[in-house]
């Protein structure tokens, strides 16, 4: 039983040691390549910082390289903060370019307009020659009217079908600058901006501004022409942009494996148009389609091989004249010297081949379930809605063009060849041309928010715009299983989903938590060689995102320094731009974004450092703690797991671990505070420090003064006691008097020798020499004090020894027993090991002998069989010989 008990004790000790050694503790890593989705504001960078819209953008130096990382991420062009910011920012720039500030509510009055013109353009119901009723009977094939740069009608603006611009002159009376005095004003309006009523007057019609009573309409205070701006988005310090670099990405990819990381997007150009996207940066030598995940909204990138372009022109001259309506209110009118011709656009390039490729690409799209016959896939215009929907809407240097695209659609679709019936009811629209007529409006619907704006007249003179068509905005409508329509759309926002839909914004989370077997204050401070920062750029450390956790952790020091250096560098760049452009911060949205970006970056860095500091890990790359890992079953695979994968697994533990780390740090600070109270006792060598001797002398002087004061008190008490016995020391004796007055007592003999004290004789009178006796008295008292201290210390030490002696003896006995038990167990193990060795040797010897014997028998048997086989011919020959004999 004793042996069994010893064995159980040893087993328990081994299990305890094993548990202590196998406990995992939380370790904090700073600089790990991990991230999470973010929604913070981005800022812009551009090469052309001379335009009004880019004055606050950072200078672009094309030094925005991309790094491929071995990770898998989800991308969605429609659920994307980058595209949403682009849409909002471009709208703000678009709105700022016109600077609306003057409300035109005074113009919501009845105006007297030229009836001939209102009838001509069909505003009063008396249509002139503008429309003709057409039946839906079959029509013969119509010849195409295709023009190019060499066609003379382009120069003369005299191409067939183009008419005069529909404009109407109106008059109205208002109270002007003089009180109670009306003034008549003359203005010229585009016909589509007015709504008129029948009037009894034969020469005038009663007209109003269209929708003036239902919307807040504003006019520009100053004219800024909406020219295209090229810029790129950049992430603030501490953030990054991921891009899906897969050619098969179609707007939504839950698992994109070809991912690159950068600090900025590609260059993009501001686009504001319906139906088409112009001058985009995503055009490639192929056609591809971004398809919304939950609807039929699409954005189609056209093949740049076909060189698709659109050229628009507003012919003839115009004169712009400001009209003062009242004090502080000015409206701009357009007096017409002669009837101008309408604006128009023509298309160049291989449009038919491009549209055919769009149809073929649509058939191959995984989301498409309609007919596979491209001849039954039609490119159509929307059925109705706002003018920006039914017409192709674009801006040409300040002029807002609304182009009727029927001629163009007939041309690219060859509609007269498809069954012989036209889908339009107007014979004028039954033509096939590569150019289209456009009308101009001064009151337009806003494309991002509900509302209307009145724009200033554009520049005077002839205006021409040239654009490259790079995309189509469309919705896929399945009429039935045999027919599909590609319906053009007015979703301007889709243009930016194509431009930036393959990006996603992430926040770098450099703080990682993982279990290790190292506990705080148990590591040895190994010396490290100083290294310079490995220049990978700000996001260089994310190149290790696809590496295993162990490999990434080796370079945490360099990664964290690179992270900090990149943050500081970008902070300085932003600060320089803000300082240079302080006076322009209110011009565009970028000034505010730059400030907000800087604040965001500072807040993120301070937040990370504050969190590390609350854990006691400030400015450390690897920080071991005393907090046990809360989930023993969740252990990282350091050789085959990335930090991003690990962070996703432990995300649910982060709050609990954070709380435990903070509590442990608070407890550690309390312990340090208690330890600092004993700071003078931690190192005994400090007692002999030269600076401590002054303090020791002070303590000695205070002790001496205390002893003297104590003795004075004792002397006073004794003196009072002697006075009660009949003695009276004289304190006020003259200097020559050296002896007290003798005081006689009775003749009774003392009961004990020396009862009355030392110094007097045994007679009837005594005296006390004050000066000498007091010195002797002090010496005796000091001797008594030292003797008492010595006796007390000796007794205390003796008692301590007597108390500790049994404990020490018991501890010594226990250690001897443990040593004896360990010696016996080691002897058992040695004996067992020797027995095991002997058994293995005996088994090996037996197996060897058995194998040798068996091999000998097998070899002999094989020899016999072989000899028998070899003897067969001889036996046959001998048999034949015997037969012949």
From Swiss-Prot:
Residues 640-672 form a coiled coil. GO terms for biological process: membrane fusion involved in viral entry into host cell; symbiont entry into host cell; virion attachment to host cell. A lipid is attached at residue 793 (S-palmitoyl cysteine). Residues 745-764 have a biased composition (Basic and acidic residues). The keyword Transmembrane helix applies. Residues 170-212 are annotated as: V2. Residues 677-698 are annotated as: MPER. Specific enzymatic cleavages in vivo yield mature proteins. Envelope glycoproteins are synthesized as an inactive precursor that is heavily N-glycosylated and processed likely by host cell furin in the Golgi to yield the mature SU and TM proteins. The cleavage site between SU and TM requires the minimal sequence [KR]-X-[KR]-R. It comes from the Viruses. GO terms for molecular function: structural molecule activity. Pfam families: GP120 (PF00516), GP41 (PF00517). Residues 1-23 form the signal peptide. A motif (Di-leucine internalization motif) lies at residues 884-885. This is Envelope glycoprotein gp160. The gene is env.
């Amino acid at each position: 039983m004793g042996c069994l008990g010893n064995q159980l004790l040893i087993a328990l000790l081994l299990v305890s040691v094993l548990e202590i050694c196998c406990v995992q503790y939380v370790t904090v890593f700073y600089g790990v390549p991990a991230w999470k989705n973010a929604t913070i504001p981005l800022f812009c960078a551009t090469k052309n910082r001379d335009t009004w819209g880019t004055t606050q953008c950072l200078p672009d130096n094309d030094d925005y390289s991309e790094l491929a990382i071995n990770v898998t991420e989800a991308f969605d062009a429609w659920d994307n903060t980058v595209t949403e910011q682009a849409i909002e920012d471009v709208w703000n720039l678009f709105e700022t370019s016109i600077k609306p500030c003057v409300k035109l509510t005074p113009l919501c009055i009845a105006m007297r307009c030229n009836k001939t013109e209102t009838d001509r353009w069909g505003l009063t119901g008396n249509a002139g020659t503008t429309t003709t009723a057409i039946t839906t009977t079959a029509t013969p094939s119509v010849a195409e009217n295709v023009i190019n740069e060499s066609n003379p009608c382009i120069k003369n603006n005299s191409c067939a079908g183009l008419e005069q611009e529909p404009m109407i002159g109106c008059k109205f009376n208002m109270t002007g600058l003089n009180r109670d005095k009306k003034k008549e004003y003359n203005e010229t309006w585009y016909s589509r901006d007015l709504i008129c009523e029948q009037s009894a007057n034969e020469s005038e019609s009663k007209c109003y501004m269209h929708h003036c009573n239902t919307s807040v309409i504003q006019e520009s205070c100053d004219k800024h022409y909406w020219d295209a701006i090229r810029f790129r988005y950049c992430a603030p310090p501490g953030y990054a942009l991921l891009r899906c670099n897969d050619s098969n990405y179609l707007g939504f990819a839950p698992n994109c494996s070809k991912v690159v990381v950068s600090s900025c997007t590609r260059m993009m150009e501001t686009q504001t148009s319906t139906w088409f996207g112009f001058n985009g940066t995503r055009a490639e030598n192929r056609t591809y389609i971004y398809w919304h995940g939950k609807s039929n909204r699409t954005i189609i990138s056209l093949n740049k091989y076909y060189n698709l372009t659109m050229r628009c022109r507003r012919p003839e001259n115009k004169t712009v004249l400001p009209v003062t309506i009242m004090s502080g209110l000015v409206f701009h009118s357009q007096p017409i010297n002669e009837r101008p011709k309408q604006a128009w656009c023509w298309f160049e390039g291989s449009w038919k081949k491009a549209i055919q490729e769009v149809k073929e690409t649509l058939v191959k799209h995984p989301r498409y379930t309609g007919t596979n016959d491209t001849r039954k896939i039609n490119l159509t215009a929307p059925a109705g809605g706002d003018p920006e929907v039914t017409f192709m809407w674009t801006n040409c240097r300040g002029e807002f063009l609304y182009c009727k695209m029927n001629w163009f659609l007939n041309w690219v679709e060859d509609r007269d060849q498809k069954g012989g019936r036209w889908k339009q009811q107007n014979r004028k629209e039954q033509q096939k041309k590569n150019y289209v007529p456009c009308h101009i409006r001064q009151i337009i619907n806003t494309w991002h928010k509900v509302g209307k704006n009145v724009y200033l007249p554009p520049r005077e003179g002839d205006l021409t715009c040239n654009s490259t068509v790079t995309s189509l905005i469309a919705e896929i409508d399945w009429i039935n299983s045999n027919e599909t329509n590609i319906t053009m759309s007015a979703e301007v926002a889709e243009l930016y989903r194509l431009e930036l839909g393959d990006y996603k914004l992430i926040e770098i989370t450099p703080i990682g938590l993982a279990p290790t077997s190292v506990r705080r204050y148990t590591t040895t401070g190994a010396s490290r060689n100083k290294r310079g920062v490995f220049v990978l750029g700000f996001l260089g450390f994310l190149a290790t995102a696809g590496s295993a956790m162990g490999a990434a952790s080796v370079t945490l020091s360099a990664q964290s320094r690179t992270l900090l250096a990149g943050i500081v560098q970008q902070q300085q760049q932003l600060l320089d731009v803000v300082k240079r452009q302080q006076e322009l911060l209110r011009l565009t949205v970028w000034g505010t974004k730059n400030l907000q970006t800087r604040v965001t970056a500072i807040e993120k860095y301070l937040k990370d450092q504050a969190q590390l500091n609350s854990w006691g890990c400030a400015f450390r790359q690897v920080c071991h703690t005393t907090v046990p890992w809360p989930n023993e079953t969740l252990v990282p695979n350091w050789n085959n797991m990335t930090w991003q994968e690990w962070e996703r697994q432990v995300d649910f533990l982060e709050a609990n671990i954070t709380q435990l780390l903070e509590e442990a740090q608070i407890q550690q600070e309390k312990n340090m505070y208690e330890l600092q109270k004993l700071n003078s006792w931690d190192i005994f060598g400090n007692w002999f420090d030269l600076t401590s001797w002054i303090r020791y002398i002070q303590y000695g002087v205070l002790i001496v003064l205390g002893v003297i004061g104590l003795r004075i008190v004792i002397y006073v008490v004794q003196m009072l006691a002697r006075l009660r016995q009949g003695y009276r020391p004289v304190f006020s004796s003259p200097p020559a008097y050296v002896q007290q007055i003798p005081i006689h007592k009775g003749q009774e003999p003392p009961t004990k020798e020396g009862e009355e004290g030392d110094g007097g004789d045994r007679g009837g009178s005594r005296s006390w020499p004050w000066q000498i006796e007091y010195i002797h008295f002090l010496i005796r008292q000091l001797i008594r004090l030292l003797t008492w201290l010595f006796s007390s210390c000796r007794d205390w030490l003796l008692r301590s020894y007597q108390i500790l002696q049994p404990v020490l003896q018991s501890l010594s006995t226990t250690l001897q027993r443990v040593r004896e038990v360990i010696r016996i167990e080691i002897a058992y193990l040695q004996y067992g090991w020797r027995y095991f060795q002997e058994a293995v040797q005996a088994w090996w010897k037996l197996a060897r002998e058995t194998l040798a014997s068996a091999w000998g028998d097998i070899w002999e048997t094989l020899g016999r069989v072989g000899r028998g086989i070899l003897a067969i011919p001889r036996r046959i020959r001998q048999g034949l010989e015997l037969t012949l004999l």
